[in-house]
Amino acid sequence: RRVALPTHARPLHSELLAKQAAMEEALESAPWNRLALRGKVGIIASGIAGLYAEEAIFELDEDISFLCIGAYPLPKRLISRMLSHVSRVLVIEELEPVVEEQVQILARIANPNVEILGKEGFIPREGELDYFLVRNAIARMLGKAERQALQNPAVSILPPRPPSLCAGCSHRATYYAMRKVFGKKAIYPSDIGCYTMAVNMGTVDTCLCMGASITLASGIRFGGETEGICCSLGDSTFLHGGMTGLLNAAYNKARITVTILDNSTTAMTGHQPNPGTGMTATGEATVQVSIEALARALGAGMVETVDPYHMDETIESFQRAKEYPGLSVIIARQPCVIKARRSGARRKPFQVSEDCIGCKICLDFGCPAIEFERDMARINALCTGCGVCAAICPSSAIQEVAR
């Protein structure tokens, strides 16, 4: 009876409605919903906005009725009691007017004459709320003076901090080689992960949802794009949501290059293992899925694996992928630099010699370990010893520190 065939779905729908009605009844007296009837002006707030509203009511020292909603389904009886008691009510919630619209419906029965305020001129539909925004909305409703939000002087003093990959991150090297080969006119769909931080390298044109890099790349190609298309996603993202997109690209003969940034972990969200690491979430050894074998089985005509720290070989591999007449896959494999250092792996750092000509090519590479001072590059203590900056330096001025 749990298989939703038509004969089962109809009674299951009735069961669901009955469960929701029972939940609604139970929540009328739940501690998460709190009603305090006071003056003829009221506030209905949900979630974190309820805490902001309570603090604002205390500061304004007004006799305001207050309903804090902390659970769904909405407590309709509590809302109706509030509406019957007040002549004006302000609904405070983040983003869309979900609660506000329900309040408007209930008001037709409870109190058709009540004035309902909310998203029109008081609470924004975008962004998150804060205390000053809520406090000023209540003050505006009451006709009282609004307060200016506290200014953070650090915002105007500190330089902007654009998105950036870690020092020594192999994704930076992969993207550098990718851009070197595919150029400015190419399309670069990307995905969800720490590699999204490479947006300033000019190789992240889209970021929609997990696995969308491949499907977007296919769609762009079949939409008539003639320039090169090179998409990118991580190993975890590929195994989670990219395989069907790759199969679809192969099946439909999409001429695109898919770059799988394999750092052997799920770095963006806490370094969890994935099926390609050979380890479960509890640390047990398990089957290690081969991304190369998967890519070939799903129909990719060209599959190559590179170490992005080896810049020349990586560029050559991307060149072959660009020229390939069908679906090509480049697997850029190098362990996450944070995970590698935690496991005890150490490389010799690099330094800049007097041969530096100040061309700033290494600075444009975007590594946080590279600074520029007195017309010369300088490598700071963040250096992990990946050596990619040395590989791209035209004057061979970056060299490994001798120990």
Roles of regions detected by a PLM:
Residues I44-S46, P189, S232, T259:
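Short hydrophobic segments within beta-strands
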Residues R1-L165, S170-H171, P308, E316, ...:
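Flexible, low-complexity linker and terminal segments
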Residues E55-F66, K184-K185, A293-G299:
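Short helix-loop-beta junction
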Residues V41-G42, R88, I187, G228-C230:
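Structural motif
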Residues Q148-I214, G223-T226:
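Active-site diphosphate/adenylate-binding microenvironment
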Residues G47-A49, D191-C194, D262-T265:
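Short glycine-enriched loops at secondary-structure junctions
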Residues M197-I331, R341-S343:
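Thiamine diphosphate
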Residues S65, I187, R255, G301, ...:
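Residue-level detector of anion-binding/catalytic polar loops
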